[in-house]
Amino acid sequence: MGGSSSEKNISIKTGNAIIKALSTKYNSICPISISIDNDLSFLKQIKKGDIVFNALHGGSGENGDIQSILELNNIIYTGSNSKASKICMDKHVSKLVVQSEGITTPDWILYKNSKFSKQ
């Protein structure tokens, strides 16, 4: 929980809610507040646990960065894998993937590099 994005405070609230819910059933919960600033020291503590419950919001917590780090270190975690996280963070790409699977999605406009591209 925590992180370095503008959503840090909501991530802490989410983490605290998860801790409260899990503590009714599990005794050994170890909250870890992290900041992805090229500091991977949190990995030593995470590796001691059975599973990581990812409560990070925005930025590295949702864009696949933290998921990639956990995957590279063979750490089990909750939530989407790094590839799905990267795709979903880019709404244009996620809509293209959805369409490629035959799922209808409303038309959209992509604004990129000062130009409009209607899809």
What are these regions (language model features)?
Residues 97-105:
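Basic phosphate/pyrophosphate-binding loop/patch that engages nucleotide-derived ligands
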Residues 1-83, 87-93, 100, 112-118:
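ATP-binding N-terminal substructure of ATP-dependent carboxylate-amine bond-forming enzymes
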